[in-house]
Amino acid sequence: MILGIGTDLANIERIQGVLDRFGDRFRNRVFTDVEQAKSERRLDVAGTYAKRWAAKEACSKALGTGLRMGIAWKDMSVSNLSTGQPVMHVTGWAKARLDELTPPGHEAVIHVTLTDDHPWAQAVVMIEARPILPDVQTAQTT
């Protein structure tokens, strides 16, 4: 079952302006060390940050709160699998909200997709509640 869907569009040039003006103050307030390391290694630094900004906004919308109720920027973090697929991680208040949304007997799965076409970066986040299936091996032995 779908618990929430969020989307966001970020202007890469605006993010570049914020990076130019506020530098590390902005980076350290919004992005985790992992996100910063990934972004700074990329050819399009601002575009990479913009996609992660959009992902955090989209995730907060999928959680049904936006950036309110104690949820902070760093409570949501994007990393990538070895295949390049983005993965959303939640901690702190965002994790608490996710746990609150997830029905008993289910596990939450966060799906995220990122794209950009200069000057825009976009993210879509969908939160799914997946039923936890009983352990088949345990069921066979009882």
From Swiss-Prot:
<dbReference type="GO" id="GO:0008897">
    <property type="term" value="F:holo-[acyl-carrier-protein] synthase activity"/>
</dbReference>
<dbReference type="InterPro" id="IPR002582">
    <property type="entry name" value="ACPS"/>
</dbReference>
<dbReference type="GO" id="GO:0005737">
    <property type="term" value="C:cytoplasm"/>
</dbReference>
<keyword id="KW-0460">Magnesium</keyword>
<dbReference type="GO" id="GO:0006633">
    <property type="term" value="P:fatty acid biosynthetic process"/>
</dbReference>
<feature type="binding site">
    <location>
        <position position="57"/>
    </location>
    <ligand>
        <name>Mg(2+)</name>
    </ligand>
</feature>
<keyword id="KW-0479">Metal-binding</keyword>
<keyword id="KW-0443">Lipid metabolism</keyword>
<dbReference type="Pfam" id="PF01648">
    <property type="entry name" value="ACPS"/>
</dbReference>
<protein>
    <recommendedName>
        <fullName>Holo-[acyl-carrier-protein] synthase</fullName>
        <ecNumber>2.7.8.7</ecNumber>
    </recommendedName>
</protein>
<dbReference type="InterPro" id="IPR037143">
    <property type="entry name" value="4-PPantetheinyl_Trfase_dom_sf"/>
</dbReference>
<keyword id="KW-0808">Transferase</keyword>
<keyword id="KW-0963">Cytoplasm</keyword>
<keyword id="KW-0444">Lipid biosynthesis</keyword>
<comment type="function">
    <text>Transfers the 4'-phosphopantetheine moiety from coenzyme A to a Ser of acyl-carrier-protein.</text>
</comment>
<comment type="similarity">
    <text>Belongs to the P-Pant transferase superfamily. AcpS family.</text>
</comment>
<keyword id="KW-0276">Fatty acid metabolism</keyword>
<dbReference type="InterPro" id="IPR008278">
    <property type="entry name" value="4-PPantetheinyl_Trfase_dom"/>
</dbReference>
<keyword id="KW-0275">Fatty acid biosynthesis</keyword>
<dbReference type="GO" id="GO:0000287">
    <property type="term" value="F:magnesium ion binding"/>
</dbReference>
<dbReference type="InterPro" id="IPR004568">
    <property type="entry name" value="Ppantetheine-prot_Trfase_dom"/>
</dbReference>
<feature type="binding site">
    <location>
        <position position="8"/>
    </location>
    <ligand>
        <name>Mg(2+)</name>
    </ligand>
</feature>
